[in-house]
């Protein structure tokens, strides 16, 4: 992939580097009520449902805004006001789930583990057995603050066995790590346009179990975030209730075409895994230590311990690497200083090697010697 047309390269978990074709798709203006745009939206939703294997059981409801908008909409719509959510936390985005429940005044309890410790099915089993008031369990599949992968399928089986409902934030995994609605029972799985599908940010979407969505009328705290009302209106008219992000939808439609051309989820996962493996190997040669062990590291974003050298300052390091054509991500841990490097986006292993070379050059220029 040529870098000439797209510098700097974003090695972040989203927004991320997109292809020229995806950006070009935004050069066309669309009427938000026009039949062509309605068909575009319908096509996007059908293709998304196919990725998750949700045809016949789930409904794809798109929503304007960031992924967090869609997460809040899912909780607000699908959790009744007298429900109770068990929130599983091992990072910043799990904490955000709890904050959403607090703001929406949905009763909740939490299970928080260390940032490098995945939640286990045994943890969930114990807590559900102890508290029959819990109606829903909410978790992050891939916690973006570290890159840790939580055991979704095992947790989903426990939740189902207890007769509870599962809400999955799959923002950083959907499209690159397999999730099959026929094997993983969930009431809602939430993702967004600007992550592993390599679209641009601005649209979230919720795969809602159709029966649960139909039963949720009147639950939502908000007009704009009411997924049941959004779906009912779209089913009746083919249109969004309120002004849609037309260019974002068009870009996602094109990004999905490229996703399919590449070979779908297996091919996307292979490329990201190659990116991650290359990144880890090259960074280890520079002396960097990754925060997570390999067995729980998702090929989405890697957290590295910051250099121990007292001359290291992230802001200076970031700027030097940026000048060389690569944008990194600050750390988001509470206990140790780190920084993050994304493996996703329209990039390949060759560009990961170029990025690590730029990191090495930046450290030498800054005279950061102790890694």
Curated annotation (Swiss-Prot):
Cofactor(s) needed by this chain: pyridoxal 5'-phosphate
Keywords: Aminotransferase, Pyridoxal phosphate, Pyruvate, Transferase
Temperature effects on activity: Optimum temperature is 50 degrees Celsius. Activity increases from 30 to 50 degrees Celsius, the enzyme is inactive at 70 degrees Celsius.
N6-(pyridoxal phosphate)lysine PTM positions: 195
Domain of life per record: Bacteria
pH dependence remark: Optimum pH is 8.5-9.
Reactions catalysed: (2-aminoethyl)phosphonate + pyruvate = phosphonoacetaldehyde + L-alanine
Pfam families tied to this protein: Aminotran_5 (PF00266)
GO molecular function: 2-aminoethylphosphonate-pyruvate transaminase activity
Protein induction: By 2-aminoethylphosphonic acid.
Regulation: Inhibited by phosphonic acids and very slightly inhibited by aminophosphonic acids.
The protein's enzyme class: transferase
S-S pairs: none
Cofactor stoichiometry and binding remark: 1 pyridoxal phosphate per subunit.
Biological processes per GO annotation: organic phosphonate catabolic process
Subunit structure, interactors included: Homotetramer; however this is for an enzyme with a molecular weight of 16500, which is in disagreement with the weight of this protein.
UniProt-listed HAMAP family: PhnW_aminotrans_5
Biological function: Involved in phosphonate degradation.
Protein name: 2-aminoethylphosphonate--pyruvate transaminase
Provenance organism: Pseudomonas aeruginosa (strain ATCC 15692 / DSM 22644 / CIP 104116 / JCM 14847 / LMG 12228 / 1C / PRS 101 / PAO1)
């Amino acid at each position: 992939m040529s870098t000439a047309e797209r510098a700097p390269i974003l090695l972040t978990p989203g927004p991320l580097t997109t292809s020229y074709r995806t950006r070009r798709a935004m050069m066309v203006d669309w009427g938000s009520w026009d039949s062509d745009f309605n068909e575009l939206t319908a096509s996007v939703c059908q293709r998304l449902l196919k990725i998750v294997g949700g045809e016949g059981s789930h409904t794809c409801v798109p929503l304007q805004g960031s992924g967090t908008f869609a997460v809040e909409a899912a909780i607000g719509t699908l959790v009744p006001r007298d429900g109770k959510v068990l929130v599983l936390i091992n990072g910043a985005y799990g904490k955000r789930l709890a904050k959403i429940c607090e703001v929406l005044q949905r009763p909740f309890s939490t299970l928080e583990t260390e940032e490098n410790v995945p939640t286990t099915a045994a943890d969930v089993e114990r807590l559900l057995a102890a508290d029959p008031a819990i109606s829903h369990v909410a978790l992050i599949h891939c916690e973006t603050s570290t890159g840790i992968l939580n055991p979704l399928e095992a947790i989903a089986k426990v939740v189902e066995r207890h007769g509870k409902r599962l809400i999955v934030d799959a923002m950083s995994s959907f499209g690159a790590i397999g999730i099959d609605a026929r094997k993983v029972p969930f009431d809602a799985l939430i993702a967004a346009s600007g992550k592993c599908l390599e679209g641009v940010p601005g649209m979230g979407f919720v795969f809602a179990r159709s029966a649960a969505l139909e039963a949720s009328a009147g639950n939502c705290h908000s007009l704009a975030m009411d997924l049941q009302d959004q779906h009912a209106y779209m089913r009746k008219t083919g249109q969004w209730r309120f002004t849609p992000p037309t260019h974002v939808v068009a870009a996602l439609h094109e990004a999905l075409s490229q996703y399919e051309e590449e070979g779908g989820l297996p091919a996307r996962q292979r490329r990201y895994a190659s990116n991650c493996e290359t990144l880890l190997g090259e960074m280890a040669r520079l002396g960097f230590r990754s925060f997570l062990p390999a067995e729980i590291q998702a090929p989405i974003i890697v957290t590295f311990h910051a250099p121990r050298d007292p001359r290291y300052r992230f802001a200076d390091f970031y700027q030097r690497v940026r000048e060389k054509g690569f944008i990194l991500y600050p750390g988001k841990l509470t206990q140790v200083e780190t920084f993050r490097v994304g493996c996703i986006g329209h990039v390949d292993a060759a560009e990961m090697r170029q990025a690590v070379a730029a990191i090495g050059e930046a450290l030498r220029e800054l005279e950061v010697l102790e890694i």
